[in-house]
């Protein structure tokens, strides 16, 4: 059983591409248009964001070295703060993984409507999305090697237009176009940078991917830290070079209303055929990242089920070590949410749910930063000041992202935390049939 499972584990390059693919996902293709409302000054926002994202990646890299247990943030929170915060972390992250997939598949299939206009019909779009979601559930059931190979190909395809614009877009870059829209936000310098951060801070969600999937990675103590930092660096370079190039290619007024900035830039430079290729690559990038996020949903639930914090069904695995039942449950839940979003009234509510689910990932990030301070105590050696600085930067990065969120999103995130508290109590009672030990001594640690 163990040797069969080891044979299905993945190496450094596929897991690095999974990290970068999960980070960039679908958002990279809309970033230039989103940042156009601020202008070229967004470059400063990128610099701040990249510092924070690298800090967070270093936190996860060090944590995965100190504790290579599968589950990522869940494993760290449970070890350092006990089963309650471990349970809370896992539920939040598990929800974020599969809810985010629903928004991502809509964007990916939407890009395919460039080739198949029938996909613009809401019913056809929804049915296609459900089919695509199940394809990636089934690919995950085949095994982690299969899904990381698929995502590696998808990430490479997605990188074609991104790297193409990042490298060759500069031949069509015009400094006057870029500087003419240096700051069109109507805010001062600090305010403009803050408005940029509200967009860019979210662009590195997924930095934890390798640590969550440590259970299916070869030599996780070595490969997970390298893949984490490497994936962030790949995403950072692609983000900055490509978005900056496009902001100097397309006039700000046109860029603000662009539904496909990369496609528009490619058409401007090389014609309609190039635009079609970019649309295909964008669809591949969006849909390919579904595989990685579905993998994480299955692995984080399995890690919690192995510890008794999730129902045992999530821990059932096949010969390849794949949590088949847990993945099928995720597939059913994604199908229900996808079908419910077909209603125009439900679409708005689902948009709120998607935004809240992104905040769900920030709570595990914060717990991981705190866990490093605890678990790393006495293990940093002479690098202690450096790690304290890095952890502080990562912590502030997460706090700033929460502050930049909408009030309604933060409120519903807090409500979810309260519901999870009650769920933990019910789960505890399910696992422990004896009365709660009222005379248990209070720990003085």
From Swiss-Prot:
Lineage: Bacteria, Pseudomonadati, Pseudomonadota, Gammaproteobacteria, Enterobacterales
Periplasmic side: 25-40, 114-123, 172-188, 248-272, 344-346, 405-408
Annotated site, Cytoplasmic (distal) gate, chain positions: 93, 208, 365
UniProt comment concerning the protein's domains: Each subunit has 12 transmembrane (TM) helices; TM1 and TM6 are interrupted by short non-helical Gly-rich loops in the middle of their transmembrane spans. Each subunit has a central cavity which binds substrate.
Described function: Major component of the acid-resistance (AR) system allowing enteric pathogens to survive the acidic environment in the stomach. Exchanges extracellular arginine for its intracellular decarboxylation product agmatine (Agm) thereby expelling intracellular protons. Probably undergoes several conformational states in order to translocate the substrate across the membrane; keeps the substrate accessible to only 1 side of the membrane at a time by opening and closing 3 membrane-internal gates.
Binding, agmatine: 23, 96-97, 101, 104, 203, 205, 293
Residue stretches spanning the membrane: 12-24, 41-62, 84-113, 124-142, 146-171, 189-204, 223-247, 273-301, 325-343, 347-370, 385-404, 409-427
Reported impact of residue 101 to D: Nearly wild-type Arg-Agm exchange
Domain of life, per lineage: Bacteria
Pfam family, one: AA_permease_2
Site (Middle gate): 293
Name of the protein: Arginine/agmatine antiporter
Predominant location category: membrane
């Amino acid at each position: 059983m163990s040797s069969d499972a080891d044979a299905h584990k993945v190496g450094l390059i596929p897991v690095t591409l999974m990290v970068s693919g999960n980070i960039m996902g679908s958002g990279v293709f809309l970033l230039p248009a989103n940042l156009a409302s601020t202008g070229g000054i967004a470059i400063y926002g990128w610099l701040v964001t990249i510092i924070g994202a690298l800090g967070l990646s270093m936190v996860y890299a060090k944590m995965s070295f100190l504790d290579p247990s599968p589950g990522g943030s869940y494993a760290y929170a449970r070890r350092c703060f006990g089963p309650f915060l471990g349970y809370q972390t896992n539920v939040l992250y598990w929800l974020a993984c599969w809810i985010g997939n629903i928004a991502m598949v809509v964007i990916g299939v939407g890009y395919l409507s460039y080739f198949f206009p029938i996909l613009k019909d809401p019913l056809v779009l929804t049915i296609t999305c459900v089919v695509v979601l199940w394809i990636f559930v089934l690919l995950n059931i085949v095994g982690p090697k299969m899904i990381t190979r698929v995502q590696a190909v998808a990430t490479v395809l997605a990188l074609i237009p991104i790297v193409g614009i990042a490298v060759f877009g500069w031949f069509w870059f015009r400094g006057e176009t870029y500087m003419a829209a240096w700051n069109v936000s109507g805010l001062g310098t600090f305010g403009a940078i803050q408005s940029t951060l509200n967009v860019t801070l979210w662009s590195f969600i997924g930095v934890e991917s390798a640590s969550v999937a440590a259970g299916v990675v070869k030599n996780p103590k070595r490969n997970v830290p390298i893949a984490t930092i490497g994936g962030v660096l790949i995403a950072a370079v692609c983000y900055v070079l490509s978005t900056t190039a496009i902001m100097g290619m397309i006039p700000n007024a046109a860029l603000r209303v662009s539904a496909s900035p990369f496609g528009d830039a490619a058409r401007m430079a090389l014609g309609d055929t190039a635009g079609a290729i970019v649309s295909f690559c964008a669809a591949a990038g969006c849909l390919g990242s579904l595989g990685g996020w579905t993998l994480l949903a299955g692995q984080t639930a399995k890690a919690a089920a192995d510890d008794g914090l999730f129902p045992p069904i999530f821990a059932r695995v096949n010969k390849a070590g794949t949590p088949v039942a847990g993945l099928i449950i995720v597939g059913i839940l994604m199908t229900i949410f996808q079908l419910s979003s077909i209603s125009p009234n439900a679409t708005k509510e689902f948009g709120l749910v998607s935004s809240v689910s992104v905040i769900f990932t920030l709570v595990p990030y914060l717990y991981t930063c705190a866990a490093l301070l605890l678990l790393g105590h006495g293990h940093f050696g002479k690098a202690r000041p450096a790690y304290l600085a890095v952890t502080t930067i990562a912590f502030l990065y997460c706090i700033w992202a929460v502050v930049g969120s909408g009030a309604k999103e933060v409120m519903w995130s807090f409500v979810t935390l309260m519901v999870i508290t009650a769920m933990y109590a019910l789960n505890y009672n399910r696992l422990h049939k004896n009365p709660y030990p009222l005379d248990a001594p209070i720990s003085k640690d």
